[in-house]
A protein has these predicted regions:
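Short Gly/Thr/Asp-enriched flexible loops that form oxyanion-binding sites at enzyme active sites
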Residues: 1-13, 39-40
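A conserved helix-loop-strand patch within extracytoplasmic ligand-binding domains
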Residues: 14-22
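Phosphate-binding and adjacent anionic-ligand microenvironments
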Residues: 21-182, 188-212
Length: 212
C-alpha cells in the first residue's frame, strides 16, 4: 500500500505467520547469512527457532530437508516452504501463501510498520578474481579472530561479524568473481562505523569499497 520494497528476509519473517502454530519450539526457520537481525528476532518472537544458513538456493534446499524446516528465505527474495510444499523456491506458491495471509487480516504494510527501524546497506559487490576473493576472506579471518570473540563470528559462508554497532558480512559470491559486502547498524552512525571497518579491512588487502 505504501509503495515500499520489502526484502526477502523481512518477507520471510512475515510469512512465518502462515506456519501452523503447533510445536513452534521444535520448528526452525532458516534465513540466509545476508539477512537482517530484525528478521531473525521477529521469527523468534513468534516462538520459532531461527537459523543462519548459507546463501544460495541449492544450499537452502539441502538444509530445509536436513532439518525438516517449514520455511526458509533469502534476502534476495527466494522463499522456500517445507510445511505443506516441497521445500524449493516457487514464486507462484509463495504469492499464494502471501495472499492467504492477507485474506486472514495479516497485512504486510502493518507488519513492516511494527518493525524497528533498520540501518542496513544494500548488497555491495567488490569485484576481484576468484583467487583473490578467497585469499581475502582467509586473510581477514585471521585479523577478525585476533580482535573478536569467536562467539561473535560466523564462518559458515564468508565472515559475519557482530559488534556493538551491529554486524557486517564479507563473503565470496557463488556466481561472480566478486566479494559481497553487507552491514546493518543500530543507527545511521553505527552503520557508518561498520562501513569504515569493512572498508579498512579490504583496503589492507588491496581492494576498494566504494561509498554506497
Amino acid at each position: 500500500k505504501q509503495g515500499r520494497s520489502v526484502a526477502g528476509d523481512l518477507l520471510t519473517a512475515f510469512l512465518a505467520n502462515s506456519i501452523a502454530t503447533n510445536n513452534k519450539n521444535n520448528q526452525t526457520i532458516i534465513l540466509d547469512i545476508k539477512s537482517s537481525y530484525v528478521a531473525y528476532e521477529n521469527i523468534m518472537s513468534l516462538g520459532f527457532k531461527a537459523e543462519i544458513g548459507k546463501t544460495g538456493h541449492s544450499n537452502i534446499k539441502k538444509r530445509i530437508k536436513e532439518i525438516k524446516s517449514p520455511l526458509a528465505g533469502e534476502m534476495s527474495g527466494h522463499i522456500f516452504f517445507g510445511d505443506t510444499y516441497f521445500g524449493y523456491d516457487d514464486a507462484l506458491y509463495a504469492a499464494i501463501r502471501l495472499l492467504t495471509l492477507t485474506a486472514n487480516n495479516f497485512e504486510l504494510d502493518k507488519f513492516i510498520s511494527t518493525l524497528p527501524e533498520t540501518f542496513v546497506s544494500p548488497e555491495i559487490k567488490v569485484f576481484c578474481s576468484d583467487e583473490i576473493k578467497f585469499l581475502t576472506i582467509d586473510n581477514i579471518s585471521k585479523k577478525v579472530f585476533e580482535k573478536y570473540n569467536s562467539n561473535d563470528v560466523i564462518t559458515l559462508d564468508g565472515l559475519r561479524v557482530k559488534n556493538n554497532h551491529g554486524w557486517w558480512l564479507i563473503r565470496a559470491s557463488n556466481t561472480e568473481e566478486a566479494l559481497v559486502v553487507r552491514f546493518e547498524g543500530k543507527s545511521e552512525k553505527s552503520k557508518k562505523e561498520l562501513f569504515l571497518e569493512v572498508k579498512n579491512l579490504l583496503k589492507n588487502e588491496g581492494l576498494t569499497l566504494d561509498n554506497y
